């Protein structure tokens, strides 16, 4: 919005040309989202408290968590407000990638809001049924996957439609340009051609999988938001590189026209996330809830697809992956042993993984900060793939 206004006035007001710089708008987006969160945070928390949307705590979880019962949840709304306002102010609203990542983020946010609402109203920690939640996530994820399959491959909205129609006329068998291939980290000359169907399948798994992985990680005060900020900021660096014809050529990456605007969204997400952490740090005044976790996870997955860094997301989001795998292993092993021996057995003391460490004697703050440190190291490792190829 402000970019369009600046472009209209820059012939008369020369200093407005600074708005054309991605880096300037990225810093501005971070500060804007941060200030919105810090200013609106107390008001949002008061409103959530008045609405009595307190978190229902699992009785079979760590006993230290019982004191958190009643802490207002659905605080992810604060993050989404900061992201929305900051992105709309500072991003190029003619950019197609901005709108698809906004659609996924807020679409998943609505799913999370409904889930949180049911938890609060019915006092049931389970919320929306897994099948219902998965259906709506799949609907949004598949739409985004189909759109991104063609928008990543072309430089303009018109050519995106032309490419889609060419695929239809080919009997759904046409391939995609090389820029849509799966990039293999550390290997500068090796990519894996996905084709349309492979791209759609991978994108769907990345978006929906990331959303649920972040949601599973959101279990302790401040645990998930800092990794989201770190991973999102790192993806913003990739967006800046992939969106630049000069830097992408120098670093031997495919140039994705328009991907640079993802830096603005990542910056807004980082600022909003830090503002939320101000209130979510231990002891938390507010919880993110599914409205925030599902939305942020979906956003990370979508951005990773746009900048062609799906594998790097897997690396940098290693904490999210570990939390998800711990749940899958726990459930699978429990069901297998119950069918085999008549009694379910567990691999971990409790899943997701952060609860296992709590029950092993780690303090909540120790788990949180150590997971932050691990994520920071993984993000630095992921960023190293920019040059170590």
UniProtKB/Swiss-Prot annotation:
It is found in: Cell inner membrane. It comes from the Bacteria. Its EC number is 2.7.8.13. GO terms for biological process: cell division; cell wall organization; peptidoglycan biosynthetic process; regulation of cell shape. Its cofactor is Mg(2+). GO terms for molecular function: metal ion binding; phospho-N-acetylmuramoyl-pentapeptide-transferase activity; UDP-N-acetylmuramoyl-L-alanyl-D-glutamyl-meso-2,6-diaminopimelyl-D-alanyl-D-alanine:undecaprenyl-phosphate transferase activity. One of its GO terms (cellular component) is plasma membrane. PANTHER family: PHOSPHO-N-ACETYLMURAMOYL-PENTAPEPTIDE-TRANSFERASE, PHOSPHO-N-ACETYLMURAMOYL-PENTAPEPTIDE-TRANSFERASE HOMOLOG. This is Phospho-N-acetylmuramoyl-pentapeptide-transferase.
């Amino acid at each position: 919005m402000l970019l369009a206004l600046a472009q209209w006035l820059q012939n008369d007001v020369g200093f407005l040309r600074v708005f054309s710089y991605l880096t300037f708008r990225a810093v501005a987006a971070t500060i804007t989202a941060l200030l919105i969160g810090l200013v609106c945070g107390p008001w949002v928390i008061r409103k959530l408290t008045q609405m009595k949307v307190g978190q229902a705590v699992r009785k079979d979880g760590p006993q230290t968590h019982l004191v958190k019962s009643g802490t207002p949840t659905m605080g992810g709304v604060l993050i989404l407000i900061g992201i929305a306002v900051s992105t709309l102010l500072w991003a190029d609203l003619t950019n197609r990638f901005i709108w698809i990542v906004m659609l996924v983020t807020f679409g998943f946010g609505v799913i999370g809001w409904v889930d949180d609402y049911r938890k609060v109203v019915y006092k049931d920690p389970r919320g929306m049924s897994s099948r219902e939640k998965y259906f709506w996530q799949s609907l949004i994820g598949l739409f985004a996957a189909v759109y991104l399959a063609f928008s990543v491959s072309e430089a303009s909205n018109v050519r995106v439609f032309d490419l889609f129609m060419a695929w239809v006329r080919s009997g759904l068998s046409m391939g995609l340009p090389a820029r849509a291939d799966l990039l293999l980290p550390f290997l500068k000359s090796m990519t894996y051609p996905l084709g349309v169907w492979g791209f759609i399948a991978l994108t769907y798994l990345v978006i929906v999988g990331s959303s649920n992985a972040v949601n599973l990680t959101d279990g302790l005060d401040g645990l998930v938001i800092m990794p989201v900020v770190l991973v999102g900021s790192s993806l913003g660096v990739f967006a800046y590189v992939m969106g630049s014809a000069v830097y992408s050529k120098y670093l031997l990456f495919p140039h994705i026209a328009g991907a640079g605007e993802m830096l603005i969204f990542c910056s807004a997400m980082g600022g909003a996330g830090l503002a939320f952490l101000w209130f979510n740090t231990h002891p938390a005044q507010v919880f993110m809830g599914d409205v925030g976790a599902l939305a942020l996870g979906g956003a990370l997955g979508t951005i990773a697809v746009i900048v062609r860094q799906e594998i790097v997301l897997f690396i940098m989001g290693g904490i999210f992956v570990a939390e998800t795998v711990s749940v899958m292993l726990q459930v699978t092993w429990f069901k297998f042993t119950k069918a085999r021996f008549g009694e379910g057995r567990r691999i971990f003391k409790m899943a997701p993984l952060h609860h296992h460490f709590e029950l092993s004697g780690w303090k909540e703050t120790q788990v949180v900060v150590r997971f932050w440190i691990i994520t920071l190291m993984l993000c630095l490792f992921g960023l190293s793939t920019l040059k170590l190829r």
